[in-house]
From Swiss-Prot:
Keywords: ATP-binding, NAD, Nucleotide-binding, Nucleotidyltransferase, Pyridine nucleotide biosynthesis, Transferase
PANTHER family per the UniProt record, alphabetical: NICOTINATE-NUCLEOTIDE ADENYLYLTRANSFERASE-RELATED (PTHR39321), PHOSPHOPANTETHEINE ADENYLYLTRANSFERASE (PTHR39321:SF3)
GO terms classed as biological process: NAD biosynthetic process
DNA repair found in the keyword field: no
Annotated family: Belongs to the NadD family.
The protein's name in its UniProt record: Probable nicotinate-nucleotide adenylyltransferase
Keyword Glycoprotein: no
Annotated HAMAP family: NaMN_adenylyltr
Function text: Catalyzes the reversible adenylation of nicotinate mononucleotide (NaMN) to nicotinic acid adenine dinucleotide (NaAD).
Chain's gene name: nadD
EC number: 2.7.7.18
Length: 211
């Protein structure tokens, strides 16, 4: 069975940290493919801070072109707004692209994961997809452990297991993550994009005058 990692996010813009994390998760969790899912209208983000979907999707395509395991899926563009992960997952599972059997893994930062109870139908998500928890800079693992325990998960040699939900996995030794917000602030202060972005993405931003 093919193992597909789903990497959802605003990607405003996609940066080197996103790619490094995807590569790390693919290696550690033996993923056959990592699909980047740009959010069309994320419910927890301010719309006036986000560049149009078409630009964000194109930047992802450019960045993924050098890795055959990476791809961009723009399914959220055609779904109801705002973008809810549970709806995106259901649409993906019934799409022609993934109609064959596949095991899905959702990459998520631990800072976002501990807010899971605020997500639409979060119990359905835990029942239908394996989560891969990605560490975040300056974020205590103790908070993650407490939240998982509160949800009823038990840590085992295989991961975090639950009687009703699918197994969760923690990435070990993953690279520290910078945020897209930090990248934008660096650009505002110094005008330097090339340090933290793939060259093709930096070129695209300069060409179209984004941020």
């Amino acid at each position: 069975m093919k193992k597909i990692g789903l990497f959802g996010g605003t990607f405003n813009p996609l940066h080197n940290g996103h790619l490094q994390l995807a590569e790390f998760a693919a290696a550690q969790c033996q993923l056959d493919q990592v699909v980047f899912l740009p959010a069309a209208s994320p419910p927890h983000k301010k719309g006036d801070e986000i560049v149009p979907f078409s630009h964000r999707a194109e930047m992802i395509r450019l960045a993924c072109s050098r890795n055959k395991r990476f791809s961009c899926n723009t399914i959220e563009q055609d779904l109801a707004r705002p973008s809810y992960t549970v709806d995106t997952l259901q649409a993906l599972k019934t799409s022609p692209l993934y109609k064959s059997e596949a095991q899905f893994f959702f990459l998520i930062g631990v800072d976002a994961f501990i807010e899971l109870k605020t997500w639409k139908a979060y119990r359905d998500l835990l029942s239908e997809i394996n989560f891969i928890l990605c560490p975040r800079k300056l974020f205590s693992r103790t908070q993650t452990v407490l939240f998982l325990t509160e949800l009823g998960f038990v840590q085992t040699p295989l991961g975090w297991e639950h009687s009703s939900y699918l197994t969760l996995y923690e990435l070990e030794g993953a690279p520290d993550q910078v945020s897209s917000t930090e990248v934008r602030r660096t650009f505002e202060k110094s005008g330097d994009l090339y340090q933290k972005l793939p060259p093709t993405v930096a070129d695209y931003i300069m060409k179209h005058g984004l941020y």
